[in-house]
Amino acid sequence: MTRPPVTDWSTDFDHLDPRWVENPYPIWDELREKCPVAHTERFRGVYFPSRYEDVRAVAYDTENFSSRRIIVRETPPPRIPAPPITSDPPEHRPAKNLLLPAFTPDAIKQHEQPTRDICARLIDRFAGKPGCDAAIDYAQEIPVRVIAVMLGLPESEGDRFRKWIHEILEAGITRPDILMKAMGETSAYFQAEIDKRKSEPRDDLITQLSRATIDGQPITEDHLLGALRLILIAGIDTTWSAIGSCFWHLAQHPEDRRRLVNDPALIPTAVEEFLRAYAPVTMAREVIKDVEIGGCPFKTGEMVLLSFPAANRDPRMFPDADRVVIDRKENRHAAFGLGIHRCIGSNLARMEITVALQEWLKRIPEFHLDPAARVTWSEGTVRGPRKLPVLLG
């Protein structure tokens, strides 16, 4: 379906507009100076704060903004819980505490070598060839496999998981039928896996969460299915998008790439800068009480597009915000969110991104964009390259 063209980004923005999808940064820069809190009647009314302080204010305000709807969609579906990301206080804290043990630094350390092995096997497939798609052949494969192992699922299910992610996070924004079909399929899939573990428990996250309790009571089936769906979707798409954006940058900036090849110790610092500059995740909040943020009134019932990527490009917060400085010293970016919903998987994501870069640069120090092919980007909640054709060597 053809979408009506945007007439004015301040009063009629559309985050699915091809210009926004392809290169949102100039649009955000313009809004930050001209209209720091934009509004559109599309999607039944949405606000877009573009300054760090306003994004932060909304993220921390759980009295006036709810997380029960975290994606701006054309037609709001029935409420689909995915605790803790869709939970408000007081339910949020116990739901988050259930997942935290699996994502501590010590817990993630155990997954580092298996992640290196995954990266090495993937690189074996295209090392020595003239080129590859750094998104499809590499970035999109890593988190799928890592999360599958954590959940106790076959790595071979990757295509199925990628299909669901596309349907839920992209196609489902404007097609509620596609969304609800995918949600039903994920629920049925996870229910079957839960049933298997009742008779054959395993050392995996599905088994652990199946036994979880809150205040001494087993969590509900809806809670369990929602939490597993969250781990699958949020644990895969966000990280592969971040990894892909790193390679998109390095394929165009040989000076940065060579610095990292010559000084691998700089990679973790560079990862933080890539996360700042190319943060993948934009969340949403629902206005539940009339309130004013940044001098702009927010009306009950409308949505807020909570863009951590836009906040990370605010020059009031980050000097040279539009420059990628891979050895940036002070970098309090918001790539993993702000407030109570800050991403619990940040340790895992950082590890995967760092390992993905280390293993690739060790074996493929030279690569650049394929001038005969086109980079394409995802649209909607998570931004990252969907296709990233590169030439090797």
Please give the residue ranges for each predicted region.
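Cytochrome P450
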Residues: 1-393
